[in-house]
């Protein structure tokens, strides 16, 4: 069994949260993940800016930040693979959906799976890694029903 906790720390209700939960569970199934646990925290631009500055020394907002915990030996839950936390800026969900010409539903699911893949060890630092990671994201979104 997989466990994902969703925390809405945004200033308003996030109507796409149930869809994101369903999509993450879909991704678990397609990626054949079992017994994993992680958190998704929805925040605003101000909050993610502070996190980005404090932990990455980058003085600007971003769309998604992940904190991998799997290698942290102090976090041990028997029978579970504890992956970490995914922070998503809902302000960026809104602005990027508009910029890219698609729905906020697609954008929040994109950022959710992007964060999950980072926690699983995927990255996009090289062109080869970027093609692999973004290809997998695109495939999951497409098969779920996003065009």
Model-derived segments and spans:
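An acidic/histidine-cluster motif and surrounding catalytic segment
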Residues: 1-109, 120-147
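Periplasmic solute-binding protein
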Residues: 117
């Amino acid at each position: 069994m997989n466990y994902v906790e969703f925390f809405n720390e945004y200033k308003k209700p996030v109507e796409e949260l149930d869809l994101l939960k369903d999509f993450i569970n879909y991704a678990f199934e397609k990626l054949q993940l079992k017994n994993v646990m992680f958190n998704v925290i929805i925040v605003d631009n101000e909050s993610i800016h502070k996190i980005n500055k404090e932990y990455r020394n980058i003085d600007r907002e971003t769309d998604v930040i992940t904190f991998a915990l799997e290698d942290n030996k102090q976090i041990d839950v028997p029978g579970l693979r504890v992956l970490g936390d995914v922070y998503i800026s809902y302000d960026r969900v809104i602005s990027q959906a508009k910029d890219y010409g698609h729905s906020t539903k697609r954008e929040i699911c994109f950022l959710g799976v992007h964060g999950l893949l980072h926690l699983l060890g995927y990255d996009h630092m090289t062109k080869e890694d970027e093609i692999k990671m973004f290809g997998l994201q695109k495939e999951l979104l497409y098969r779920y029903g996003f065009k």
